[in-house]
Amino acid sequence: MPSTVAPIKGQDHFLNLVFPERVAAAYMSPLAQKYPKAALSIASLAGFLLGILKLITFPVLCAAGLFVFPIRGLISCLFHKSFQGCSGYVLATFLSLFSLALTIVGIVSCITWAPGFIFPMISVSIAFATVETCFQIYTHLFPALEHKPSSSLKIEIAAAKLPRSSSAPDLNYPSLPTQSASPSQRFSA
């Protein structure tokens, strides 16, 4: 019996492993809709703390993905008796391998750099990890807010739908002056 739920893509498997706060934020989304100020405060604090730890947890979770994703893919293949559910796990395994390889290359290349360059790079990496963690939390905590048009856009859409009378001037496109100005008057402004 085919399932009506869309399969989770490989990149989602990978991001859910590397950013476990995505899963927690999606789970807590109904509460965040009720208490948005408290949710933003908690999300900011969690993003800051988890972002600092992300420099350590990212390579560890990528390495764990090299073992977890193939096993979950095999279990999915055996459970569904087809290779259709396995492709997402294969992609997630390759994403884990690629991310771990880039991390190892970055660490090894840091050996040849001067300490005056390494420490600012570490602080930039921590800042990037914190921002990315906050972004992952926010987008999964408030998923309904992503596609709502802003109020100014609603006003523009409503104004575009109103019928215009021929006698009312169009304020968006002012009419040209009917009198021709002399060349000296045109350049004096």
From Swiss-Prot:
Repeat as UniProt keyword: no
**GO cellular component term, pick one:** plasma membrane
Record membrane topology: Multi-pass membrane protein
Q: State the source organism's domain of life.
A: Bacteria
| Keyword Cell membrane recorded | yes
Check the record and name the InterPro entries matching this protein. Answer: DUF5422 (IPR035358)
Keyword annotations: Cell membrane, Membrane, Transmembrane, Transmembrane helix
Specify the protein name. Uncharacterized protein CT_006
Taxonomic source organism: Chlamydia trachomatis serovar D (strain ATCC VR-885 / DSM 19411 / UW-3/Cx)
